[in-house]
């Protein structure tokens, strides 16, 4: 199963440098903290619609080439993050199999728990970069994060109903 928002997410084109944008847009796109938490601060009940969660081969995560270690298997999680039931964000997380050892194994078992609830409670979380992307009228971003030094790639597309717009 897929979702049209995930097709748009995969079509994001990334800027080489941070573009000159309105402060409101940059505030969302360069957010270092949890998007889940920011959505909750809007007074909304945040929930996850799980689209896909499975091990996949390299061919299904080509966008991670050069950004993550080359491995034969990756854990892929695709979701819609909803606020009061309305989709505000499409998310795609790519995790190399080698990252899934020790406490990071929990990444395979998040189910309908927002990724941010796990990531931003970890004292071992670091972020290597945030890249801003765009597809038509929608904005997104991708980040390489590390848990205990082990990488994962998170891509987020802000959907039309989100407060970014």
From Swiss-Prot:
Pathway: Cofactor biosynthesis; ubiquinone biosynthesis. GO terms for cellular component: cytosol. It is found in: Cytoplasm. GO terms for molecular function: chorismate lyase activity. It comes from the Bacteria. Keywords: Cytoplasm, Lyase, Pyruvate, Ubiquinone biosynthesis. The keyword Cytoplasm applies. One of its GO terms (biological process) is ubiquinone biosynthetic process. Its EC number is 4.1.3.40. Removes the pyruvyl group from chorismate, with concomitant aromatization of the ring, to provide 4-hydroxybenzoate (4HB) for the ubiquinone pathway. Belongs to the UbiC family. This is Chorismate pyruvate-lyase. It comes from Salmonella typhi.
């Amino acid at each position: 199963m897929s979702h049209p928002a995930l097709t748009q997410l995969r079509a994001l084109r990334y800027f080489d440098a941070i573009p000159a944008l309105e402060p409101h847009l940059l505030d969302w796109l360069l957010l270092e903290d949890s998007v889940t938490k920011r959505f909750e601060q809007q007074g909304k009940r945040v929930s996850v619609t799980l689209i896909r969660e499975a091990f996949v081969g390299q061919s299904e995560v080509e966008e991670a080439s050069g950004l993550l270690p080359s491995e034969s298997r990756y854990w892929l999680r695709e979701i819609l993050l909803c606020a009061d039931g309305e989709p505000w964000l499409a998310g795609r997380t790519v995790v190399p199999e080698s990252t899934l050892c020790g406490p990071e194994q929990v990444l395979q078992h998040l189910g309908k728990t927002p990724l941010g609830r796990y990531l931003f409670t970890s004292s071992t979380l670091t972020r290597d970069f945030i890249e801003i992307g765009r597809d038509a009228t929608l904005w997104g971003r991708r980040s390489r994060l590390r848990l205990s030094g082990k990488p994962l790639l998170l891509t987020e597309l802000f959907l039309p109903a989100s407060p970014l717009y």
